[in-house]
Regions:
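Nucleotide/phosphate-binding sheet-loop regions of phosphoryl- and nucleotidyl-transfer enzymes
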Residues: 1-190
């Protein structure tokens, strides 16, 4: 049997910190004691080691295990990635065996895309919800651009600042849904 690289939160516990990292072990433990933790999974520290050994590539075995667990998560949560009526949105958080506050990356709202955003807004066409959805999408693209695509945070912040200046506002919260949609499109263009 091959090595296990992915654990649902229900499969881990607090003693597995070396394998699951601090966040993964704690999420598993919170699940075990019955706290209301949305179901998810942890990719092990051994998978990270293998990723580096494979030249910074996720090998087929690990990818298959990740996809199998995504399917389990979809089933458990009753949602599906890319579904226009009931999309699954997840947070991706990096972790380590030891606590490193402020050093680990996060991507929120993985699962949002242009089609999902339009469908969500069509299902609840209020100005407040439209702004909320576009702000979430803008934040997702911003985090993804920084963490995955390695587009510098400073550059992204310059785009946001330019939009605020163009609109004559001081705070991100003063940007409209249309402004946030335009920012999301600018981020994707980069």
């Amino acid at each position: 049997m091959s090595k296990k690289y992915v654990y649902l939160f229900t499969e881990g516990n607090a003693t597995m910190r070396e394998l699951l990292g601090g966040k993964g072990a704690n999420l598993a433990e919170m699940t075990n004691i019955g706290l209301p933790v949305p179901q998810g999974f942890t990719i092990t520290t051994e998978a990270c080691t293998q990723y580096y050994e494979d030249g910074r590539k996720i090998n087929d075995e690990i990818m298959a295990e990740i996809m199998k667990n995504v399917e389990k998560m979809e089933e458990i949560n009753g949602k599906k990635f890319g579904d226009l009526t009931n999309p699954l949105l997840v947070s991706v958080r990096s972790g380590a065996r030891a606590s490193m506050p402020g050093m680990m990356d996060t991507i929120l709202n993985l699962g949002l895309n242009d089609d999902v955003v339009r469908a969500m807004i069509a299902a609840n066409p209020t100005p407040e919800f439209e702004r909320f959805v576009y702000d979430s999408y803008r934040r997702f693209i911003q985090m993804f651009s920084d963490v995955v695509m390695e587009v510098g945070k400073k550059y992204i912040e310059q785009l946001i600042d330019a939009m605020k200046e163009k609109k004559g506002v001081t705070f991100d919260t003063e940007l409209t849904a249309a402004d946030l949609r335009e920012l999301a499109n600018q981020f994707k263009a980069e």
